[in-house]
């Protein structure tokens, strides 16, 4: 049996473009994609921290070091320039793989440069 686990996420990136009439997808700065391990054309989940909307699309590579996070096509109705988003991917893992799995977590600065990376989410305390 396979378990679906968080593969990676880019946390608190800022939307730089919302292009309704561009072919659908989400363009992501190539440096962020590489650090997170997101492949071009991979399915991504986008969670808009600003407005609470969630949607699924696919990633396209943006220019390295550009800071671009461009929500395109119909998904542009779900985000505005300046919104904070979390971009995540999931993968299916065998039990052995799941036991050893550590997600790739990339934390973004407000200009979409990398603040830091991690491979676990801190324990939430009351």
UniProtKB/Swiss-Prot annotation:
The keyword Cytoplasm applies. The modification Pyruvic acid (Ser) is found at residue 25. It holds the Pfam family Asp_decarbox. Keywords: Autocatalytic cleavage, Cytoplasm, Decarboxylase, Lyase, Pantothenate biosynthesis, Pyruvate, Schiff base, Zymogen. The keyword Mitochondrion does not apply. It is found in: Cytoplasm. Its cofactor is pyruvate. Pathway: Cofactor biosynthesis; (R)-pantothenate biosynthesis; beta-alanine from L-aspartate: step 1/1. Is synthesized initially as an inactive proenzyme, which is activated by self-cleavage at a specific serine bond to produce a beta-subunit with a hydroxyl group at its C-terminus and an alpha-subunit with a pyruvoyl group at its N-terminus. It is an enzyme of class 4 (lyase). Binds 1 pyruvoyl group covalently per subunit. InterPro entries: Asp_de-COase-like_dom_sf, Asp_decarbox. Substrate binds at residues 57, 73-75. Its EC number is 4.1.1.11. One of its GO terms (biological process) is alanine biosynthetic process. It catalyses: L-aspartate + H(+) = beta-alanine + CO2. GO terms for cellular component: cytosol. Heterooctamer of four alpha and four beta subunits. Catalyzes the pyruvoyl-dependent decarboxylation of aspartate to produce beta-alanine. Belongs to the PanD family. NCBIfam families: panD. This is Aspartate 1-decarboxylase. It comes from Acinetobacter baylyi (strain ATCC 33305 / BD413 / ADP1). The gene is panD.
